[in-house]
């Protein structure tokens, strides 16, 4: 698959096969993700990959973020209650994804937008390579509303959660 095709055809997937992703394929995906550009070449991102019980625990914690998103969804999709219910179901199980990635960055200071952009570029690489390799993904920002709980669970300090990616 060429780059143009990957960019045009990649979609957010919300229902996954239970098939584990081979370790060598994950290494390939993360290797390419980390080739993303970064301001001042800081490369100050960190990715946490969770599977099995740890993934299930994370999903349980992150699913509480739906409570914070529901009022926004009610406004956006007042005429489409099925979308709201589908979103609620997705947050509870993440579509059965076999793994979840949490993407963080280490900020240089309180107003550090460069670091946010750095990790966003790496996430985009990750999503495109996963798609090119036949894997689905979904860039989720909702779980950021429960960042403190997720970070405590992962043992992360002094970093900012940007996304959860099943």
Predicted regions, residues:
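N-terminal amphipathic, basic helical "cap/leader" segment at the start of enzyme domains
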Residues: 1-96
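Small-aliphatic-rich amphipathic alpha-helix that forms the alpha element of a beta-alpha
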Residues: 29, 33, 101, 106-152
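Short secondary-structure junction motifs
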Residues: 42-45, 132, 162
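A glycine-rich helix N-cap at a beta->alpha junction
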Residues: 67-71, 154-166
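Short coil/turn connectors at secondary-structure junctions
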Residues: 96-99, 135, 158-161
